[in-house]
Amino acid sequence: MSTTKALSLLVFILFVSLVHSSDQCPINSIYQFGDSISDTGNLIRNGPASSPTPKPLPQREHNVFVNFGVSGSTALNSSFFSERNLHVPATNTPLSMQLAWFKGHLRSTCHGSSSDCLKHSLFMVGEIGGNDYNYGFFQGKPMEEIRSYIPHVVGAITAAAREVIRAGAVNVVVPGNFPVGCFPIYLTSFPVKDTKDYDDNGCLTHLNEFAMDHNNQLQEAIASLRKEFPDVAIVYGDYYNAFQYVLRSERFDKSVALKSCCGTGGAYNYDGKRPYGAVGVPVCQNPHKFISWDGVHLTQKAYRFMSKFLNNQILSQIKCTRA
């Protein structure tokens, strides 16, 4: 776990918006669970050369950012994948472990009731779950088998949200999945010959439909959570439509909308055998034109535009507690 001034850019921009609205709705801390979308160094810190259970870094007196997200992590425990003959890396830090870190952090820093400590906090439970499906897709599992994972993944995410609520959280954002059929890594790895299998933006329809299936089931689970905890603001983070908003924006170069900024080769400037950071792979010189940074993650500009879409949605639903 790392405590840092900047989580993902997406979360950081959201925090700035909350600070600016602090007169109406004071938020003094953000707790982030997730994967590489939010990881700012936990994978390295939690690697073979480090302690397997990192200790919390000291908090600042105000405006606390605590990030439990680890690159490559899953919503489900590793045993789920081993039972299905899927390999996941030893560094996998599933939601259950991230929650254990959170509980340890809370015990070491909260000297009153956890409800009092968390009443001015915002919890981001995700984005997570994409890797649960990735391990199936990229290890050759059929679509219908991977689709059967969705209820399990959604169950793990909602169980995590339930745990932080029981700990005292009153503002919880649960993001959905991206339209992964628009990402260079998927467009390159799973090409199809029939142009009817691509939408008007050039994205793979069947993969976007899969993401929507996950998102629909997640929203149904969130609706149930709201009935279970009527006094808690549980907000669905619509990353799918936030990305589509970016894709439609005139502020990006349409000719490279589906291409990786840092990469090489192929129609989407992405080669899984020579990813960003590999020897000979050029660094992008004009990231302001691109949506995708490395074929998997987005550019800072894209995240900034996503945040514009998300901020009003989230800010209008969070629970304000001044006492």
UniProtKB/Swiss-Prot annotation:
Source organism (scientific name): Arabidopsis thaliana
Cell location: Secreted
EC number(s) recorded for this UniProt protein: 3.1.1.-
One GO MF term: hydrolase activity, acting on ester bonds
Superkingdom of source: Eukaryota
Name this protein carries in UniProt: GDSL esterase/lipase At5g03980
Pfam families registered for this protein in UniProt: Lipase_GDSL (PF00657)
Uppermost EC category: hydrolase
Signal sequence coordinates: 1-21
Keyword check for Glycoprotein: yes
Family: Belongs to the 'GDSL' lipolytic enzyme family.
Entry keyword Hydrolase: yes
CC annotations in GO: extracellular region
